[in-house]
C-alpha cells in the first residue's frame, strides 16, 4: 500500500511568501527559504513552490529562490506558476526542481503538456486543476484563478491524464486559505474520473479535515499551507494524528 504524502505549499510573490483566501488578498508573511527549511526539518514529505502571479505578469522569478532552497532542503520539490515552454521546465529542473506543475499554459495549448511529458517523463510533470464551483459543476480557472477558462474542471483533469501527466494537483478556489475543510465532493469526483495520483489542495484546517477527506475521496496526498504558515499545528502533530486514525503516513 502506498503511503499518504503531506506536501507543504508555499505561494510566492517576488521574494516573499504570501497567503490570502480564495487565491485573493495575498499578503506577505515571510521568507520562502526559511519556510521551506523549517517544514523540511519538521518532516514534510514534499514541497510545492508556487509563483502566485507569474502567469499574470509574464515572468518566472522562482529560480533564484529554488536554488537557495535546494542548498538546505533534500526532499522532492515542485515548482509552478509561469511555466510556459520547455525551456522554463529545463531551467527549473536544472535549478533543482524534481517536478513542475502546469495549468494556464496547458489550458491554452495542450500540446505543450504532451511535449513536456514526452521530453521529461510523466514523473516530472504535474497537471494543475484550479477549480471554482458553479451550482452543480466546477470550472477550471487560469492565471492564478483570475480568469475563467470555459473548461469543465473534471474534463480538464481527464485531459491532463490523457496527456500523460504523472499526477494532478486539484485546488479548490472556494476553500483556499479558509481552513474550514476540503471540497471533498470535487476531489472525489476527480479521483473517480481518473486513475493517476491526486493531490488535494485548499481548505485544510485540522488533521480531522485531512482524515475525513482521505476517507471520502481516496486521494494520494494533500498540499497544505495556511495551517502550517500560521502555526495552527505542526507537521509532527499532523502525522501523529493521521497515523492514529489509520492513515499510512510517511514517518
Protein language model features and the residues they cover:
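Glycine-rich, proline-tolerant flexible connector loops at the mouths of alpha/beta enzymes
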Residues: 46-65, 104, 169-180
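C-terminal helical cap(s) of enzyme catalytic domains, especially alpha/beta-barrels
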Residues: 113-120, 214-224, 228-251
Amino acid at each position: 500500500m502506498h503511503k499518504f504524502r503531506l506536501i507543504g505549499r508555499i505561494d510566492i510573490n517576488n521574494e516573499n511568501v504570501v497567503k490570502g483566501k480564495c487565491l485573493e488578498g495575498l499578503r506577505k508573511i515571510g521568507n520562502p527559504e526559511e519556510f521551506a527549511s523549517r517544514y523540511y526539518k519538521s518532516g514534510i514529505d514534499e514541497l510545492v513552490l508556487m509563483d502566485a502571479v507569474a502567469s499574470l505578469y509574464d515572468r518566472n522569478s522562482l529560480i533564484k529562490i529554488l536554488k537557495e532552497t535546494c542548498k538546505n532542503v533534500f526532499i522532492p520539490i515542485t515548482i509552478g506558476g509561469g511555466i510556459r515552454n520547455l525551456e522554463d521546465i529545463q531551467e527549473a529542473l536544472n535549478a533543482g526542481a524534481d517536478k513542475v506543475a502546469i495549468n494556464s499554459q496547458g489550458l491554452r495549448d495542450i500540446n505543450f503538456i504532451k511535449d513536456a511529458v514526452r521530453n521529461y517523463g510523466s514523473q516530472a510533470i504535474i497537471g494543475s486543476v484550479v477549480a471554482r464551483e458553479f451550482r452543480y459543476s466546477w470550472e477550471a480557472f487560469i492565471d492564478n484563478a483570475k480568469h475563467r477558462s470555459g473548461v469543465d474542471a473534471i474534463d480538464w483533469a481527464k485531459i491532463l491524464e490523457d496527456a500523460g501527466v504523472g499526477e494532478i494537483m486539484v485546488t479548490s478556489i472556494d476553500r483556499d486559505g479558509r481552513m474550514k475543510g476540503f471540497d471533498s465532493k470535487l476531489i472525489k469526483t476527480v479521483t473517480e474520473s481518473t486513475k493517476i495520483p491526486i493531490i488535494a489542495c485548499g481548505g485544510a484546517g485540522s488533521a480531522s479535515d485531512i482524515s475525513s477527506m482521505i476517507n471520502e475521496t481516496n486521494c494520494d496526498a494533500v498540499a497544505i499551507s495556511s495551517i502550517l504558515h500560521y502555526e495552527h499545528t505542526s507537521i509532527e502533530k499532523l502525522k501523529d494524528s493521521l497515523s492514529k486514525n489509520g492513515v499510512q503516513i510517511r514517518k
